[in-house]
């Protein structure tokens, strides 16, 4: 299991991202093939598919930042190596599986702390009714899913998407902030996102990662986790617990309206 890498979605310095997220997976896969390892699971990111409406397990990618670009190259390197192994060394070719993690939240993660701060502020908001699927997930469920894949008795797909944990953009904001988010008109949110991407483009995509985070916070993103559901590989959802813990860690007083929830 390769979970090594550089988890820095807002980082603009490409060389270290390339080394950790693109080169290292290839090195590990080659080492696995040479030492007789039978199954290799590489932890990638759903960010490789960018702002597409529904995340899935296809090879289609749309990187939008230095981080997602480096993760995409890591996946492409593994897919090319898989073809090479099967063609040149079929007897020792390891089974390669790319696991695309969604927006993983956990104790001590900078992204989780920032989300909790935003959700706890007067600026907490969602687009429209806020019923879009949120890709936020817990590190606990991800770890459990990794074990499920590692011990799966059948053949794994080349790419697998981490299963949805049931959160909507409204419920995720509520859990992380312990206050009801504002419901903004969808047209206003779309206009703001479009303007944000335009400004980022003028500045060499410097703010693309941040704009994308706001877009996901407002609208969410569809998740096609049909393979995991078909095979009953569904870890215990714990994202609500993680988000509420993140809010508590901020040291803010709990809203009286949610004292018993």
List the model feature ranges, each with a label.
Residues 1-20:
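NAD(P)H-binding glycine-rich loop region in Rossmannoid oxidoreductase-like domains
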Residues 26-66, 86:
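Conserved Rossmann-fold NAD(P)-dependent oxidoreductase catalytic core, especially the SDR/UDP-sugar
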Residues 65-97:
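Active-site Tyr-X1-5-Lys
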Residues 16-27, 61, 65, 69-70, ...:
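Glycine-rich NAD(P)-binding loop of the Rossmann-fold in SDR/ketoreductase-type enzymes
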Residues 49-50, 94-115:
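Flexible, glycine-rich beta-alpha linker
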Residues 145-208, 237-261:
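Mid/C-terminal beta-alpha module of Rossmann-like enzyme folds, strongest
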Residues 109-114, 128-150, 157:
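Substrate-positioning beta->alpha
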Residues 3-4, 40-46, 99-101:
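SDR active-site strand-loop-helix element
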């Amino acid at each position: 299991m390769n979970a090594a890498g550089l988890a820095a979605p807002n980082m603009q310095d490409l060389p270290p991202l390339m080394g950790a997220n693109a080169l290292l997976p290839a090195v590990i896969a080659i080492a696995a093939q040479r030492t007789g390892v039978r199954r290799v699971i590489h932890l990638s990111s759903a960010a490789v598919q960018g702002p597409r409406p529904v995340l899935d397990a296809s090879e289609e990618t749309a990187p939008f930042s230095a981080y997602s670009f480096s993760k995409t190259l890591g996946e492409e390197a593994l897919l090319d190596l898989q073809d090479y192994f099967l063609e040149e060394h079929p007897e020792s070719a390891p089974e390669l599986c790319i696991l695309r993690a969604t927006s993983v939240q956990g104790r001590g993660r900078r992204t989780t702390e920032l989300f909790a701060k935003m959700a706890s502020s007067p600026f907490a908001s969602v687009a429209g009714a806020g019923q879009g699927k949120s890709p936020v997930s817990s590190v606990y469920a991800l770890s459990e899913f990794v074990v499920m894949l590692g011990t799966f008795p059948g053949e794994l797909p080349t790419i697998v998407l981490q299963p949805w944990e049931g959160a909507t953009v409204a419920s995720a904001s509520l859990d992380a902030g312990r206050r009801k988010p504002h419901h903004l008109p969808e047209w206003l949110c779309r206009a703001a996102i479009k303007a944000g991407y335009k400004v980022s483009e003028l500045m060499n995509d410097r703010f693309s990662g941040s704009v994308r985070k706001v877009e996901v916070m407002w609208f969410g993103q569809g998740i096609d986790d049909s393979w995991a559901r078909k095979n009953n590989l569904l870890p215990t959802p714990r994202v609500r617990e993680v988000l509420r813990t993140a809010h508590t860690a901020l040291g803010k007083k709990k809203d009286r309206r949610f004292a018993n929830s």
